[in-house]
């Protein structure tokens, strides 16, 4: 009971207004005597349903939107509706949106708890109609996103269409319920367009990799006190330098061996100088680099993200390795028979540097998906809903590996001197090895066509759902046509896709 404390003036005014009975208006004799009245309850307004099928909707039940009559500067009343559904959702602040059965071209993000009813006629007054509002924005966007919020969104009498994807590997998804969202779809058509083909992977290179530098010639006999061997050539590759072996130096006192090629791959040995053999010997050829392994094709599948779907790309190839430089040639001894000329021997030619390894091809991109509804750990109920998916995109082809660079030519040994006895020539260096072939890449997986795609264990509850799917995308070819393992797998065409 609530005690009414009235001033004398107020009491007299009340008595006067009530006549001369001496009792308060609205009170019986007993409460009038004690100046107390029972506590009253203010009547509440009408219940405002999110779905008009659940009860009567009045003008003050929510925010009203019309693509043709509205303006986003309006308050969102029936007399002054807003133009876009996003503005209506923002103004609703957890309440209801009632949309005229027209086409809306802007995507909308709905916090769970905001509801949208799309079955309204608005030309000359608002009333229910058997037509539905359509949401059909441009390509490469998800028309409807539902994110976590403070309640459950009721989405009724809507037609939602996603356009064909145009970005490489892009997906066409009509609606996406993100992590933590809760929503119920009633009398809704969700239609996805076609997923886009994945982009091909880049080739390692059109031209072969950098060739090894050629070796240098040694000094001729009797041209200097020390006939210098050819200097070591070098080339810088992605995985380090390849260097030809230096040519041996020749003098009256020594005939040096040539240097070994770098990196040490078991070949490219420097030739012997004349002191260690009846005559000098040439350097041996450098070892070739290793070919890079090819990348494998992508398996079918993909990942559901806040942006939609990411397909599986093929594996990149591995680069070829640099080759070894050739060994340097050995030198000859100098002799007094050079006469008045310097008594140096002939220097050996240096080995050619090895060629660089080819760069790898890059994996083909996965094809885009066509999915009517994506559910990412969300609570979704479908009632009287039609789900239609288009075709998945083809996986991109893998890139081809780059050919390895040719090995450098060997330097020639220094010339002999025709004297008696003659001074012998220096020996040639070895050829640089050939760089390894870059590995080719795998093709991307084909994109799926699915009515519903969801994470493990989070399938929507369904009642009266009609699902139609298109064709799955084919897998992309590998960059090496002869490698069967390089082809990507085809996508899946299923009503329910669990990822």
Residue spans of the language-model regions?
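C-terminal motif of bacterial Sec signal peptides marking the signal peptidase cleavage site
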Residues: 15-17
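Bacterial signal peptide processing site
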Residues: 19-22, 28
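Right-handed parallel beta-helix/beta-solenoid
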Residues: 31-87
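The right-handed parallel beta-helix/beta-solenoid scaffold, focusing on the short coil/turn
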Residues: 61, 95, 106, 112-114, ...
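N-terminal extracellular ligand-recognition/capping segment immediately after the signal peptide
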Residues: 85-86, 93-127, 139-140, 389
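Right-handed parallel beta-helix
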Residues: 113, 118, 152-162, 182-194, ...
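Right-handed parallel beta-helix/beta-spiral solenoid domain characteristic of secreted/periplasmic
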Residues: 114-170, 186, 194-197, 205
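Glycine-centric low-complexity/flexibility signal
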Residues: 163-172, 191-371, 389-450, 464, ...
């Amino acid at each position: 009971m609530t005690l009414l404390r009235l001033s004398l003036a107020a009491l007299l005014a009340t008595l006067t207004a009530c006549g001369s009975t001496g009792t308060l208006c609205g009170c019986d004799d007993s409460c009038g005597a004690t100046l107390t009245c029972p506590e009253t309850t203010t009547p509440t307004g009408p219940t405002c349903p999110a779905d008009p099928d659940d009860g009567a909707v009045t003008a003050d039940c929510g925010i009203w939107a019309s693509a043709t009559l509205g303006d986003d500067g309006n308050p969102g009343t029936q007399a002054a509706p807003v133009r876009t559904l996003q503005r209506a959702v923002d103004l609703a602040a957890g309440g209801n949106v009632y949309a005229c059965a027209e086409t809306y071209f802007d995507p909308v993000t709905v916090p769970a708890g905001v509801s949208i009813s799309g079955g309204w006629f608005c030309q000359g007054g608002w009333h229910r109609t058997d037509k539905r509002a359509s949401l059909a924005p441009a390509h490469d966007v998800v028309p409807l996103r539902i994110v976590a919020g403070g309640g459950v969104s009721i989405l009724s009498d809507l037609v939602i269409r996603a356009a064909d994807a145009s970005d490489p590997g892009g997906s066409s998804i009509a609606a996406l319920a993100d992590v933590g969202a809760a929503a119920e779809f009633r009398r809704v058509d969700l239609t996805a367009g076609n997923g886009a083909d994945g982009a091909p992977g880049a080739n390692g290179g059109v031209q072969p990799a950098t060739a090894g530098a050629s070796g240098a010639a040694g000094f001729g006999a009797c041209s200097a006190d020390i006939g210098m061997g050819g200097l070591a050539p070098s080339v810088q590759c992605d995985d380090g330098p390849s260097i030809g072996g230096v040519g041996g130096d020749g003098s009256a006192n020594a005939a040096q061996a040539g240097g070994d090629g770098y990196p040490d791959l078991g070949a490219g040995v420097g030739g012997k100088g004349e002191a260690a053999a009846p005559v000098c010997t040439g350097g041996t050829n450098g070892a070739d680099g290793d070919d890079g392994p090819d990348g494998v094709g992508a398996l079918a599948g993909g990942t559901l993200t806040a942006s939609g779907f990411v397909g599986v790309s093929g594996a990149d190839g591995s680069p070829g390795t640099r080759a070894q430089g050739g060994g340097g040639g050995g030198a000859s001894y100098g002799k007094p028979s050079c006469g008045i000329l310097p008594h140096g021997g002939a220097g050996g030619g240096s080995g050619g540097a090895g060629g660089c390894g080819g760069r790898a091809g890059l994996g083909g991109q996965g094809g885009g998906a066509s999915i009517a509804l994506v559910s990412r750990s969300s609570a979704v109920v479908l009632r009287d809903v039609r789900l239609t998916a288009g075709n998945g995109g083809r996986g991109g082809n893998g890139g081809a590996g780059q050919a390895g660079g040719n090995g450098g030519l060997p330097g020639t040994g220094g010339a002999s001197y025709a004297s008696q006895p003659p001074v012998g020539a220096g020996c040639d260096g070895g050829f640089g090895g050939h760089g390894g072939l870059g590995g080719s890449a795998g093709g991307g997986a084909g994109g799926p066509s699915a009515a519903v795609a969801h994470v493990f264990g989070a399938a929507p509850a369904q009642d009266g759902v009609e699902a139609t799917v298109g064709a799955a995308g084919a897998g992309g070819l590998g960059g090496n046509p002869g490698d069967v393992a390089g082809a990507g797998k085809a996508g899946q065409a299923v009503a329910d896709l669990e990822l």
